[in-house]
């Protein structure tokens, strides 16, 4: 920055413009460390010499005549040809900040410090982010500090000097020897010095007849004529002369032990001070922050590598003093690749390669660069490290070699550098050998330098010791252990199932706790298998092959889990990722762009892999850490892709499993869906198993596919024990029934059974109910254990945990009511409760599953499985009627007592979740539910509630009406609880009031349904507040459906539901859709049919039904619909009764659907909340025979279910949208969703606002 007329150096107090972070700021010079190099032309012999300003007398300006002391000590006249200011200036800025800068970073105030040609007006328009024009134009004569042009003569001189450089090395006879240098003509004027290689100091010209020496007195370097140098034999000098002449003592000590005198060393404090004060003024000032970060990282790493800090300090002291004495002080820490350069380590690495002169290959320099631990940023790495070495260390290397100065860490056991020519590997081995000899305690105190051991070996050691690697190994081992344990648990679970069956027959004499443990332990992964196995029981050949497939799938899932667990750590060890070319998504929404980038490194953060990516063509300051979901991996990069897939593996695996399940279902669609197989048995076992095992299984089901299988299987979810019991009880009836037989065949057979074996059915059901009670208790315990396991397990996140919690709560709630109902009402009630519980558990698990996928699958399944469900319903209905009639005769007298007991149970269950309502119904209802199991369980509650409602109608009061007046959107969990309580009270009053025997069955049905509803409520609560509200409403509606129907007729929902009970049911269903998007398969299937018949579906529900839910009775295909049906089976049953009674008890679902649709369309435009489309007289049912009544009620139930399924699907859709919105938006959309779902017509009728209310409203008179 110095102009021709500027002084040679600046003085303290001068106002200057100082460069700070790339910009020039006003400052004042505080201190000066003066060092001016003067190139003079000797008049005597017309030669040039480079001397320091303290060797010159006269004005320091170019062209001035001065006196100078030559290398031989004589004083001659000379002309200054060039001045170089190498001083260090400490300046103070306006804000008090201090910086130590070279003269090149300073300029006098008022001087131009920008390039005129580079004003912004003349610059092309470029991205300012990439604007990199320097403030000052680069000097043409870079590296030369003089502002004057270089003359041709000087260039020639320089070239000739370079040619002579090799010759200087030949003067080896005196190298490393202590000599006496004659300072003047007098013989007495001499001083001791050490002859060193001329290569040590490029600034001092050493001619052929001269030698370069370092004085022991002032430690400076001088070029001395050979004639003035005499070899000194200090050992022969007398002690008196050693003491008398300065420097001789130091020379003697050096000669004897090669101990460097103190004046040849710089105080380590000065080194640290200069490095800290000049830390930020390195050439790349723009990257100061980066350098600081890198320096910190290096300091963290150094303790691992530096084994001899004392020797390092000794090295640095000599190096810094050497550089200062030769006129090139190191005033700031050298930087390479934005990291502080470890000169000690660099010196050692080059020494092990035989010295700088022996390294010809750029690859070796590149290796040294990497060994320093500096990231290679560009292709100039080898050149940069070589240049840095030549600048800072080459002279010192020559000095040490010529003076035979060694450092124990570097030259250990090695006499001379020249003799050192070792291969890189040998040096590595030696370094490793030497490392143990160094004091290990010094490692921590090492801030700057590194040791012999190469960074590579250090890195290898650290990698071996790294906790990540260990963690990965442990995780792999854990995965293997988990698989083994799971297989063992599977076997135990199967055995336990067999034992449970025996225990169920023996009234639970076995050890239920152990069974629960096994079932719960195996629950998460075995549940799906068990359900599938249950479904497949009738088909032994298929079952075997399917089981094998499922086992293999389970193993794959466990492996994938293990992989995903250890995957994060794998990324660190996978070298293939570094440098991988990828595409990265940048930005969000419409502004998102994709940039090409390369991965620079990977890192783990809270179990998530982060990638440091560099965008091609962008400055490194745009490098950023991104998550895997923003990276688009190239096709050829399997590793990264797999990693990405593994992260999403839960979803993909579940989707694959679902697809497989669907394919299996399709292959079996020739036959009725597996549900039909159990439908005949459903009356007995469906309720039992579904409640007891089905729920725990579904709740614990690990994958979405498993959940879907459970839903599709509906009644199939029965535990093996229940299945066996069902088969035993119904073998006589159902063995003959084929899944493929039409509904009519099933109905006729069931009618025959009912007529021939009414008493048998009751007894069987009673026994089954006892078993169910045991099983259910076991299931509750299992569910609790399962919850604990789920919480512990890494996968127990989100869906699973929610499902488990719901199922547990449901199970807990239902056991009380079920036990009471079982003891008071009969085994049938228990079976009903279990079925409902199972359905609810299914719905909860289904809710956990992706609503979309579930809906699709359910739709498909329903298309193929409608007939089986219908068959089941018809059969169940027939059996139910027979059971009801028997119960009426048997239980008519004790109906009121039962009612009182039920009411008590109601209150108990209210605290638990409404299962008590279920306990109220009588055995008749129990039979109906057990017979109908899947959906029949839901239908039965409706039938009995209607009857009960007839009896209890006068008892229904404003409380029940108030309970029903609940807005789906407005319901809060608190409101839900209160509503549930009110409904329960109303239902209790209804059940108490109803005296006829029909009431007990109705109550029982409601109870079974209610418990499932309660389960679903719990599940939905865990999932969402909305779903919780709906579920609670469902459970309340179902429990109190007996009274609800009456209440509904009296009151309608405020929002859009015409009848409180129906609206509550709709709410429950909607909430279930949201929370449990899929209810149990059986219930959902029945509901789907009924809903289709019901014209009041919401548009979404109608669509799902059209897709297949409506066509098929299977609830699997209607995920949302299923959930709604599960939640509202009782309500739906009640509604269909009301509708069907006015029409004709014997109407079949298709006709009823059309009629209902027509009615809906008619009623929709003008229907008021109290216009009940589903209302009918219970006495009409009394006029029908058992078969007609069952078929009639089933049809009604199916229609109602369809409607609710549609509502459910719509609610699920709304729920999904709400997830994306903020809380406010969610609440608003929730209200809109519930309203729209209640009022919208899915396609059954054009006007849907009022019809849904009508559909929901059930008038029982």
From Swiss-Prot:
Region feature Disordered, mapped onto this chain: 142-169, 273-310, 435-470, 498-582, 633-768, 842-953, 1067-1173, 1216-1261
> Can you locate the Glycyl lysine isopeptide (Lys-Gly) (interchain with G-Cter in SUMO2) cross-link?
481, 723, 743
- Specify the Tudor-knot domain's residue ranges: 579-631
User: Does this UniProt record's set of keywords contain Transcription regulation?
Assistant: yes
Region entry DNA-binding, spans: 4-121
Q: Which Gene3D superfamilies match?
A: 2.30.30.140, ARID DNA-binding domain (1.10.150.60)
Offer a single GO CC term for the protein: plasma membrane
What are the TM regions of this chain, as residue ranges? none
List all Polar residues biased stretches: 676-689
Q: What is the consequence of disrupting this locus?
A: Viable and fertile, although females have reduced fertility. At two months of age, animals show abnormal blood cell production accompanied by mild anemia, leukopenia and thrombocytopenia. Hematologic abnormalities become progressively more severe with age. Monocytosis is observed at 5 months onwards, along with splenomegaly and hepatomegaly. Approximately 12% of animals develop acute myeloid leukemia (AML) and/or myeloid sarcoma. Mortality increases rapidly from age 6 months onwards, with no survival past 22 months.
Name where it mostly resides.
nucleus
Among InterPro entries, the record links this protein to: ARID/SWI1_ChromRemod, ARID4A/B_PWWP, ARID_dom, ARID_dom_sf, CBD_RBP1-like, Chromo-like_dom_sf, Chromo/chromo_shadow_dom, Tudor
Q: Which UniProt keywords apply?
A: Chromatin regulator, Differentiation, DNA-binding, Isopeptide bond, Nucleus, Phosphoprotein, Spermatogenesis, Transcription, Transcription regulation, Ubl conjugation
Residues bearing Phosphoserine? 679, 719, 867, 1113, 1149
Molecular function (GO) terms for this protein are:
double-stranded DNA binding
The record's subcellular location field reads:
Nucleus
Q: Does the keyword Transcription regulation apply?
A: yes
Q: Where is the composition biased (Acidic residues)?
A: 151-165, 276-289, 300-310, 541-551, 565-574
Q: What is known of its domains?
A: The function of the Tudor-knot domain, also named chromodomain-like, is uncertain. One study suggests that it mediates binding to lysine-methylated histone tails, with strongest affinity for H4K20me3 and H3K36me3. However, another study failed to find any interaction between this domain and histone H4K20me3 peptide.
Its annotated function is as follows: DNA-binding protein which modulates activity of several transcription factors including RB1 (retinoblastoma-associated protein) and AR (androgen receptor). May function as part of an mSin3A repressor complex. Has no intrinsic transcriptional activity. Plays a role in the regulation of epigenetic modifications at the PWS/AS imprinting center near the SNRPN promoter, where it might function as part of a complex with RB1 and ARID4B.
Record's subunit section: Identified in mSin3A corepressor complexes together with SIN3A, SIN3B, RBBP4, RBBP7, SAP30, BRMS1, HDAC1 and HDAC2. Interacts with BRMS1. Interacts with RB1. Interacts with ARID4B. Interacts with AR.
In Swiss-Prot or TrEMBL terms, this protein is called: AT-rich interactive domain-containing protein 4A
């Amino acid at each position: 920055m110095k102009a021709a007329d500027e002084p040679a150096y600046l003085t303290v107090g001068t106002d200057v413009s100082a460069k700070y972070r790339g910009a020039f700021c006003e400052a004042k010079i505080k201190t000066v460390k003066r060092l001016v190099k003067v190139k003079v032309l000797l008049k005597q012999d017309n030669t040039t010499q480079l001397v320091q300003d303290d060797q010159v007398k006269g004005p320091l300006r170019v062209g001035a005549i001065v006196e100078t002391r030559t290398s031989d000590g004589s004083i001659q006249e000379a002309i200054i040809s060039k001045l170089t200011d190498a001083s260090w200036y400490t300046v103070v800025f306006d804000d008090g900040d201090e910086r130590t800068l070279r003269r090149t970073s300073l300029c006098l105030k008022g001087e131009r410090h920008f390039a005129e040609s580079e004003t912004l007006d003349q610059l092309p328009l470029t991205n300012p982010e990439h604007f990199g024009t320097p403030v000052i134009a680069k000097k043409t004569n870079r590296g030369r500090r003089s502002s004057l042009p270089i003359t041709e003569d000087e260039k020639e001189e320089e070239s000739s000097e370079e040619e002579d450089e090799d010759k200087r090395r030949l003067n080896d006879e005196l190298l490393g020897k202590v000599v006496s240098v004659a300072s003047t003509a007098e013989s007495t004027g001499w001083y001791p010095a050490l002859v060193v290689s001329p290569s040590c100091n490029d600034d001092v010209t050493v001619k052929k007849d001269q030698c370069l020496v370092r004085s022991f007195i002032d430690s400076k370097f001088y070029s001395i004529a050979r004639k003035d140098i005499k070899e000194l034999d200090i050992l022969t000098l007398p002690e008196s002369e050693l003491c008398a002449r300065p420097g001789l003592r130091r020379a003697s000590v050096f000669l004897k032990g090669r101990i460097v005198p103190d004046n040849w060393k710089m105080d380590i404090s000065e080194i640290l001070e200069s490095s800290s004060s000049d830390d930020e003024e390195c050439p790349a000032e723009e990257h100061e922050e980066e350098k600081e970060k890198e320096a910190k990282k290096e300091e963290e790493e150094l303790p691992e590598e530096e084994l001899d800090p004392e020797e390092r300090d000794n090295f640095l002291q000599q190096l810094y003093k050497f550089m200062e004495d030769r006129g090139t002080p190191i005033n700031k820490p050298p930087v390479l690749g934005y990291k502080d350069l470890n000169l000690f380590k660099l010196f050692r690495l080059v020494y092990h390669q035989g010295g700088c002169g022996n390294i010809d290959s750029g690859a070796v320099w590149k290796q040294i660069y990497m060994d320093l631990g500096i990231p290679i940023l560009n292709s100039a790495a080898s050149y940069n490290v070589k240049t840095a070495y030549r600048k800072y260390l080459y002279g010192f290397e020559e000095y040490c070699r010529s003076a035979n100065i060694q450092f124990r860490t570097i030259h250990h056991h090695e006499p001379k550098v020249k003799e050192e020519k070792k291969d890189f590997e040998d040096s590595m081995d030696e370094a490793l050998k030497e490392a143990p000899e160094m004091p290990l305690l010094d490692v921590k105190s090492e801030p700057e330098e590194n040791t012999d051991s190469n960074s590579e070996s250090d890195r290898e050691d650290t990698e071996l010791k790294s906790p990540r690697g260990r963690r990965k190994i442990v995780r792999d081992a854990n995965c293997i252990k988990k698989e083994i344990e799971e297989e063992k648990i599977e076997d135990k679970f199967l055995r336990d199932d067999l034992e449970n069956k025996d225990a169920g027959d023996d009234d639970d004499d076995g050890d239920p706790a152990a069974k629960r443990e096994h079932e719960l332990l195996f629950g998460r992964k075995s549940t799906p298998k068990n359900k599938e196995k249950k479904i497949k029981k009738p088909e032994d050949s298929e079952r075997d092959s399917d089981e094998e497939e499922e086992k293999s799938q389970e193993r794959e899932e466990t492996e994938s889990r293990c992989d995903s667990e250890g995957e994060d750590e794998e990324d660190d060890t996978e070298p293939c990722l570094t440098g991988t070319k990828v595409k990265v998504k940048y930005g969000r929404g419409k502004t998102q762009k994709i940039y090409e980038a390369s991965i620079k490194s990977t890192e783990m953060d809270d179990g998530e892999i982060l990638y440091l990516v560099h965008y091609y063509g962008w400055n490194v300051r745009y490098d950023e850490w991104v998550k895997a979901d923003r990276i688009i991996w190239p096709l050829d990069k399997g590793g990264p892709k797999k990693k990405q897939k593994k992260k999403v593996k839960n979803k993909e695996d579940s989707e694959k499993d679902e697809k497989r399940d669907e394919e299996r279902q399709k292959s079996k669609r020739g036959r009725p869906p597996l549900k039909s197989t159990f439908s005949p048995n459903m009356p007995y076992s469906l309720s039992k198993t579904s409640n007891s095992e089905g729920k725990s299984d579904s709740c614990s089901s690990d994958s979405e596919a498993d959940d879907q299988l459970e839903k599709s299987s509906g009644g199939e979810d029965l535990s093996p024990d229940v299945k066996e019991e069902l088969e035993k009880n119904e073998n006589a009836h159902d063995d003959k029934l084929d899944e493929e037989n039409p509904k009519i065949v099933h109905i006729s057979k069931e009618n025959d059974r009912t007529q021939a074996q009414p008493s048998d059915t009751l007894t069987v059901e009673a026994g089954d109910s006892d078993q169910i009670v045991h099983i259910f208790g076991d299931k509750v315990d299992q569910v609790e254990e399962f919850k604990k396991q789920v919480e512990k397990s890494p996968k127990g996140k989100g869906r699973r945990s929610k499902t488990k919690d719901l199922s547990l709560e449901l199970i807990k709630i239902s056991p009380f009511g079920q036990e009471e109902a079982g003891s008071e009402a009969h085994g049938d009630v228990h079976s009903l409760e279990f079925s409902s519980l199972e359905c609810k558990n299914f719905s909860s698990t289904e809710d956990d599953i992706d609503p979309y996928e579930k809906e699709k699958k359910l739709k498909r399944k329903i298309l193929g499985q409608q007939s089986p469900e219908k068959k089941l319903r018809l059969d169940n209905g027939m059996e139910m009627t027979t059971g009801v009639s028997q119960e009426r005769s048997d239980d008519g007298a004790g109906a009121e007592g039962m009612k009182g007991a039920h009411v008590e149970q109601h209150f108990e269950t209210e605290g638990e979740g409404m299962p008590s309502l279920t306990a109220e119904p009588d055995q008749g209802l129990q039979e109906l539910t057990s017979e109908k199991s899947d959906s029949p369980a839901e239908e039965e509650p409706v039938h009995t509630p209607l009857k009960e409602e007839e009896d209890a109608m006068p008892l229904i009061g404003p409380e029940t009406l108030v309970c029903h007046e609940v807005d789906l959107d407005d319901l809060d969990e608190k409101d839900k609880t209160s509503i549930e309580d009110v409904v329960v009270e109303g239902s209790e009053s209804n059940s108490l009031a109803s005296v006829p025997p029909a009431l007990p069955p109705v109550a029982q049905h409601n109870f079974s349904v209610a418990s499932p509803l309660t389960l679903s409520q719990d599940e939905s609560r865990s999932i969402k507040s909305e779903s919780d509200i709906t579920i609670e409403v469902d459970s309340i509606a179902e429990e109190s459906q007996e009274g609800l129907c009456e209440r509904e007729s009296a009151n309608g929902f405020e929002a859009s539901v015409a009848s409180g009970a129906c609206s509550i049911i709709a709410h429950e269903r909607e909430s279930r859709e949201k929370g449990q998007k899929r209810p149990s398969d059986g219930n959902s299937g029945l509901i789907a049919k009924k809903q289709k018949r019901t014209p009041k579906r919401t548009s979404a529900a109608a669509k799902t039904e059209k897709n297949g839910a409506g066509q098929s009775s299977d609830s699997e295909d209607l995920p949302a619909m299923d959930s709604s049906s599960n939640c509202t089976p009782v309500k739906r049953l009640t509604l269909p009764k009301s509708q069907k009674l006015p029409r004709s008890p014997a109407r079949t679902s298709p006709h009823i659907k059309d009629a209902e649709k027509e009615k809906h369309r008619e009623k929709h435009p003008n229907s008021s909340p109290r216009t009940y489309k589903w209302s009918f007289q219970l006495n009409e049912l009394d006029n029908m025979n058992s078969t007609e009544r069952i078929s009639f009620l089933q049809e009604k139930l199916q229609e109602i279910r369809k409607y609710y399924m549609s509502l459910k699907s719509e609610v699920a859709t709304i729920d999904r949208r709400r997830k994306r919105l903020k809380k406010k938006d969610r609440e608003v959309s929730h209200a809109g969703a519930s309203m729209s779902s209640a009022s919208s017509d899915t396609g059954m009728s054009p006007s849907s606002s009022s019809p849904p209310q009508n559909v929901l409203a059930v008038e029982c008179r």
